[in-house]
Amino acid sequence: YIIYGGDRMYYPVSALLIEFLILSVVESQDSYGYEISQTVKIVADIKESTLYPILKKLEKNGYLTTYSQEFQGRKRKYYSITDSGKEQLVYLNKEWISYRDTIDGIIEGRIRN
């Protein structure tokens, strides 16, 4: 199914793709949950209640670490990518390129069963 939201068209997104997006966001700079969710929401119609368990899983698997930092009088939890997370990101990027190339091949008529 496709969800139309304003000028955006959302396709269903797997948890693995969300993991890939999260690791990509955090690789460029340490980020807090809401900031990550806003970036992921550019392509995926997800709720914070979906995002936070995935962040927890990435942390449990050793791909992310967390630290707290004060912002406007409140503690904010930041996520930082680990070396294992960077390795996972490289792997997921290769998988994404292969997947994207296959879809492009089908759309462009280069791939048929």
Please report, for each region that a protein language model flagged, where it lies by residue.
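Glycine-centered, phosphate/nucleic-acid-interacting loop/turn motifs that mediate DNA/RNA or nucleotide
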Residues: 62
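N-terminal helix-turn-helix DNA-binding core of bacterial DNA-binding proteins
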Residues: 10-50
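Basic, amphipathic "hinge/linker" alpha-helix immediately C-terminal to the N-terminal HTH DNA-binding motif
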Residues: 71-93
